[in-house]
Amino acid sequence: XAEIEAEQNIE
């Protein structure tokens, strides 16, 4: 799930 980690990091 590293690909979503960046997406969650924008929060």
UniProtKB/Swiss-Prot annotation:
Q: Does the keyword Thylakoid apply?
A: yes
Keywords on record: Chloroplast, Plastid, Thylakoid
Q: Where in the cell is it found?
A: Plastid, Chloroplast thylakoid
Instruction: Give the main localization category.
Output: plastid
Question: Which cellular component terms (GO) are annotated to the entry?
Answer: chloroplast thylakoid
Q: What else is known?
A: On the 2D-gel the determined pI of this protein is: 5.8, its MW is: 45.8 kDa.
Q: What is this protein called?
A: Unknown protein from spot 125 of 2D-PAGE of thylakoid
- Name the source organism: Pisum sativum
